[in-house]
Amino acid sequence: MTPKQYKYKAFISYSHQDKKWGDWLHRALETYRVPKGLVGKETGAGVVPKRLFPIFRDREELPTSHELGRVINKALDDSSHLIVICSPRSAKSQWVNEEIKQFKRLGKSDNILCLIVDGEPNASDKPGLEEEECFPEAAKYEIGEDGELSTIRTEPIAADAREGKDGKRNALLK
């Protein structure tokens, strides 16, 4: 079976308070050149392209529209991967949480990648550190048959761009 062809290589989900990270990631991904030895190789996700283009980011892609929810849902459906910029701000963002839930409802849970830029993973499990949580709730739980978050925990796939961790460059390569 031929893998689905997507309009976007990825959809970047982030809190607008993390706009500088969204700008950086969008630019870095769209200008990234895939190593020549990988280009053209057949994988389970299709043929490896020369560039990771286009990437959906709301400020870049969205027209001024009163039907924002419909446009966002269409873009999520048209995206191969969802990249979530994780920080205490995104962990509290209703929009980021909804985008993750919708992507999971589309059956693409395995294609969610997290980029930690601030805060602590799973801090909400530690009394007194709840405000430092960087993962949105929807990133930490599976979607149930009813389309809502279940009580079954999942471990997000994450690169860590924080200083002293992977750093920006290594996190991008991951």
Feature locations, PLM:
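C-terminal interaction surface of TIR/SEFIR-family domains
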Residues: 1-30, 60-79, 88-94, 101-174
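Short mixed-charge
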Residues: 31-54, 131-144
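Short, basic, glycine/proline-bearing loop/turn elements
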Residues: 55-58, 86
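Hydrophobic acceptor-binding patch used for acceptor engagement in glycosyltransferases
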Residues: 82-83
